[in-house]
Amino acid sequence: MRNFKFKRSLTLIAVTSLLSITIVSIPTVAQAAPACDGKSPVQSCVGATSDGAPYSMMVPANFNGTVYLWSHGYRPNVPVPAGIPGYGGYTVTNTPEPGPSAAVIGALLAKGFAVMGSGFARQGWNANSALKTNIELIDTYKKQFPKTTKVISWGNSLGGFQSQYLAEKHPELINSAGALCLSSDALAISDTAADALWLIKTFFDPTIKAGNYSAGTAGYAEAMGDLVKVFTVIGSMQAGIAVNPTAPAWPATSKVPDALKAVPSRSALVLIALLTGLPMQSAHFDSTSAPAGLPAANALSFQLAINPALAALENIANAAALATFQIYDLELQTGGVWYDNTATDWAARVADERFIWASALSGESATNALLGYVAAVPKAKANPDARAKVAALGTHTGISKVPTVLYTGVADPILGASQQQSIIDKHDAYLAQQWPANREAAVKKRAVNNLLPLWGIPAEKYTKFTAAGSPDTSVAATPGTNHCNFTTKQYTAIAELLAYAADNGKHLSGGPLLTKIRKAGNMTYDRGYVAPKMKN
């Protein structure tokens, strides 16, 4: 296998995509009513809810009575020192977002829809806090604009969790909901993230704390130090694969036994991805392609072993970074160590996939050796009270009492398809038990299926290579990969589906639905599609 160089380093997801919309100054304290500029054709209003969360409203002169309430995604609750890839220089902000982008907001305003959104009172995991804020914001908006007839809740990432949460807890306040690339329950998603960081620590750098951070500034320094160490590992692995794709060197920080280092380090990457449920397609690596011009045997090796390792590496980089923020934030919120893997059966998690990805894992002996090492090392043990507190920070029932659109990319490395599938499974279970319950209560109607799940599925092949045969990660992330990687057309199509549902009390269906999602691009409605379940 020839050596190669990346055109540029692996792409990391930005912390957040804040809107570049000019709005009037944001109040820092709560006020009784919004401060509106009275401009036309679009009036902008700002204010703060009783918890101090700033909000923004934008209302067109031809307001049609429907307002979209947007909930933004995860933002770290601590500043990040400069120099850390993807996140360096971030400062904590509660700037409100009334929509996913300026282009989408503009399209909605042009059609007579109003938009609004909060910056929320706290960043990090904030599901319960955000729920209270959104409830108050809806009330504030309706009092300011009494001609409002419909409220549509939507959001992405953690904001997708919040939109689904609002639909479950207070369906009387909204007419439809959109939960995009959503997070699942607080404990489940946090465990998934922490699993990834713990496995990186286990295989590649045991000095990574991965939790149990100290109090005060010392703990903050430890968490930021973990970020640096994670990206050092990622850089080392990337360099090792570039020099020797078949058998890349283990990072210098790794302390695994010398005997285990006979297994290619790339196989440990693949195992981490499989153990945590990360997709085996990433923004730039499809797990099937090879550079042109390679001998047949080398091309097959690249397809079966190297490309999957690069996909795992790109996805792990994003998952582990978020894990550091999440672990630290939840330890601050709960007052103790909440992550626990003392009862985790790691081998059971890959009972089937180890055969599917046997080449990428370097065979059965290598897989057994890697799993044996994971089983033998000391485990993370939680404070039961802290773990219970995390579980109380937000849980979905999956029961949607208003029409709800779900949409995610199946190769999202942060909140993958399994997160959306968990909502579908809960909703299906509710429908299954509700029909006999209705019959027993002499209710002749079946429970209404309010979920419309849509999927973004990547192409089978999309990895690009330079003329020299090196992977090219400078191109845009492939649709269906990366976190909340949606186009303006896709966001607009979702918004239109939500407007139809709000007006009609049910989803668009049949030919009109299929036509709309086809025109949006990379949007699939398939009743038979079932995404993999979460690993924990």
Question: Each predicted region: which residue ranges?
Answer:
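C-terminal His-loop and adjacent cap/lid subdomain of alpha/beta-hydrolase
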Residues: A33-S153, F161-N536
